[in-house]
Amino acid sequence: MNFPSELKYSKDHEWVRVEGQTAYVGITDFAQKELGDIVYLDVTSVGQTIDKEAIFGTIEAVKTVSDLFMPVSGEVLEFNAELESAPELVNSDPYGKGWIVKVTLANASDLDALLDAAAYTTLVGA
């Protein structure tokens, strides 16, 4: 499994990539493998401010539907529109084209509570 060192990770299997005051959020390689083939994402929180650890949408796989938890507090600026027609990007490129939302980073200290790649690897037993 792949866990890029430049990202931060939540215990709920989301990742965060920070670019200035903006953060991209997606699910980890571990999460997409556990879920299986992703068939649909439902994110209706664009324009809303979501608290850290609150649900910002759902992800549907062939086997199950799971909640998506916000790893940092912030306003959801954008949903990755490519996922509407190609949700499988979450499986094939979870850290690149498969990002799910872009948010404003309300509190940079939220990042301090997240895991680095080594700690996340330990969490998932990889």
Swiss-Prot record:
Cofactor(s) in the UniProt record: (R)-lipoate
Quaternary context: The glycine cleavage system is composed of four proteins: P, T, L and H.
Taxonomic source organism: Cytophaga hutchinsonii (strain ATCC 33406 / DSM 1761 / CIP 103989 / NBRC 15051 / NCIMB 9469 / D465)
GO terms for biological process, alphabetical: glycine decarboxylation via glycine cleavage system
Highest taxon, organism lineage: Bacteria
Keyword Ribosomal protein in record: no
GO cellular component, as recorded: cytosol; glycine cleavage complex
Family membership noted in the UniProt record: Belongs to the GcvH family.
Cited function: The glycine cleavage system catalyzes the degradation of glycine. The H protein shuttles the methylamine group of glycine from the P protein to the T protein.
Lipoyl-binding domain sequence ranges: 22-104
Cofactor comment: Binds 1 lipoyl cofactor covalently.
Record-linked InterPro entries: 2-oxoA_DH_lipoyl-BS (IPR003016), Biotin_lipoyl (IPR000089), GCV_H (IPR002930), GCV_H/Fam206 (IPR033753), GCV_H_sub (IPR017453), Single_hybrid_motif (IPR011053)
N6-lipoyllysine: residues carrying this PTM: 63
Protein name in the entry: Glycine cleavage system H protein
Record NCBIfam families: gcvH (TIGR00527), PRK01202.1 (NF002270)
Keywords assigned: Lipoyl
Recorded name of the encoding gene: gcvH
